[in-house]
Amino acid sequence: MGCTRGWRLLLLLGLVCVGALQGRGQEESREVSLQYNPGSSDTSVNVVHVRAVGNGSTIHYVWSTIGTPTVLLIFTHSETSQLQVNWTKLLSPAPQGALRIEPAESVSYATALLFTRIFEYQDVNNTANFSGTDEKYFYPAYNLSDFLWDSANATINATSLSANLTGYNASDPTDSFHNGSVSFRISAYSSSGRDSSSPRLRHTANCTKLEFLVAGVRPRGNNSRFALEMVTIEKEGRKKMESVHSIDDEYTPTIFEMMQLVPDAPNSSHARGFLQWKSVAYGSPSGTRADILPCQLHPLRPFNTTFPAGSIAHAYFGDDLADAYKLEAFNISFGIADGDFYDKNRFLSWSALIGYGEPPRDSFSILVICIMAVALGTPLLLLIVGTLVVTALRHKVYSNYEPIN
C-alpha cells in the first residue's frame, strides 16, 4: 500500500515538472519590427515605432521625445494595420491628428504613458521619505519636455530590437548635465523569456521593456534622491495599482514584490494595457545585490496640470485628450532609509514592462524546478526502495522457514 502511494506521488511530481517545462514552450510569439522615423529622413526628432504582429492582431508601440517623452500602445485586431505619420502636422504647433492607425476600425484599444518630470530632493535625515519631505528641501523639478534629445538613429538595432533615447537639460543653470544624461532604453521581444540584465524581468511577446537611467548627472546636493513622475491615459475607467508577492527571489535577491498598474475596468469585454515592474532599482551599472535601491510607488492622483501640446499623445488622441480621457499622475521614488545617496555612484537604473493583455507572471526557473524535484523526489524514491527491500526480506524469511515436527 505504501509502495503504491509512493509511486503515485513520484509520478504526480514528474507530471507537474513536465507540465511546467512544456508550458514554457507553448507561449505565443510575434513577428516584431522596429523602425525609426517612419516616412521621414529627419533625424533631429525621434519617433521609434515597434510593430508586433501575430495571433490575428498587431500591437503598435510608438515612442517619441517630441514634446513630453511618451509611449503610445495601440492594439488592433488586424495583422495588416499600419501606422501613418503626417510629419508636417506632427512638427507643427497643432499636431492633433498627425498620428493614426489604418484601418482605423481595426483599433480596439489605445493608451499612453508620459514621462513628465524628475524630482530631486535633499534627504537631510536619510529617511527616503519622498512624500513626507518638506517642500523647502526640493530642488526645482526637471521638466522632461524642456530637454534636448540626441538622435536615436545610431542606437537603433533591428536585430536586438532595441533603441536609446538620451536627453540633457541644456538650460540648467547649475550645469548638472555637463557630463551626464537621462535615458530611456527600449527593448522589444518576439517571444517569451527573461532578461539577462537585472532585475531579470520575465517578458512575453505582448510587451516591451523600458529602462529609465540617470547617469553622470551631478546632484545639486550631497544627499540627493530622485523620483520620476509619469502620467497615464485611459479612456474607459481609471487605473489601479496591484501588488503581487512571490515566494521566490531567485532573480532579484531580497525582492519579493512585483507592482502593476492596470485599468480598473472589471466589466470590460477585452484586455487592456499594463505597466509592470519589480520594486527595485539599481545604483550601479553592474546591477548586483549590493547595488539594490528599493523603489516606492506613490498613489495615483488626477493630473490637472497642462502639459505641452506637442507630444505624440496629442498627435494621436486629438483635442479631446483632457475631456474624453482620464489622465492620472503617479510618482516612483528611489532609495531606502539609511542607504546610499545618488552621489555615491551617480547612477540610477529602473526597469519596467509596458504591454497588452495579462501581465507576465514570475515563475521558478528550470534549475529551481529540478532542485525541487530532486529534493521532493529523493525521499519518495528512498521510501519506495526501502519498502521493496523490506518486502523482499520478509518474503525470504518466510520462504526459508521449515516447520518443526
UniProtKB/Swiss-Prot annotation:
Glycosylation sites: 55, 86, 125, 129, 143, 153, 157, 164, 169, 179, 206, 222, 267, 304, 331
The entry's keywords: Glycoprotein, Lysosome, Membrane, Signal, Transmembrane, Transmembrane helix
GO CC term (a single one): membrane
Topology of the protein relative to the lipid bilayer: Single-pass type I membrane protein
GO biological process terms, semicolon-separated: protein localization to lysosome; protein stabilization
Residues that span the membrane, as ranges: 366-386
Lineage of origin: Eukaryota, Metazoa, Chordata, Craniata, Vertebrata
Main location, first listed in the record: membrane
Entry keyword Metal-binding: no
Annotated protein name in UniProt: Glycosylated lysosomal membrane protein A
Organism: Xenopus laevis
